[in-house]
C-alpha cells in the first residue's frame, strides 16, 4: 500500500492535496520503493507502476502535468492547451480536475490554494529557486489577494541537516537582510532552515496562513528519499487539485 501524507491545513471544500513518501512501490534499491521520478536511472516500468499506485491511492482525477524542473522561478499555468515547454518549477491551475505536481528529494515542495477553493498551485523550491523568487512568482499568479492564500510546506531537508556555504547565506541576505536569522554558523559553513526562509518570503508578499514545515527528508531515511544523503535515489511528489 502506497503511504501518502495528507497535508494538515485548513483546506477549503473543493480542493484536495497529498504528498508521497518512499513507501509502497515496486522499485529496487537504491530507488526503493515508491520512486516517481523517471529521470533518475530507475527501471521505467517500475516508475510507471509506482505512479499508477500513487494515482490510485491519492484518488487523483487525472495524470499530473510533470514539469521539467530546473531550480528556477518560472510558473506554468495549466490551461489545458498544449504547452510549448514544461520547463518550470511551479504550476498553477483554476480548472477542476487538473493536477499540479512537483517532484522533490530534499528541496521544498510548497502547495497553495485560496480560501475560496478556486485556485491552486504547486512549487518546487530548492535554495536557488527559493532565493530567485519562485514562491513570489507563484503567489503572483493568483487572482485572489495574498491574504486569502494558504500555503503548505511539504517534506524537505531539515534545519539540522542542510549545510551550506557562506555564498548561500549571502545570496539570501542580498534580497532580505532578515534571512540571516535562518542560518546558524557550523564550522566554516552554515546550517540553513529552508522552512524559515520560505515563511519569510511568503510573509513578505502577504501570505501569512502557512502550514507544515516539520519533517526532514535527510534524517527520516525510512520514509523519504534524500539526494544529499544518498545521491543516487528516487523522488517523491506533492500534488494539489480542484475537485
Indicate residue ranges for each PLM-predicted region.
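Active-site microenvironment for binding and transforming phosphate-containing groups
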Residues: 1-243
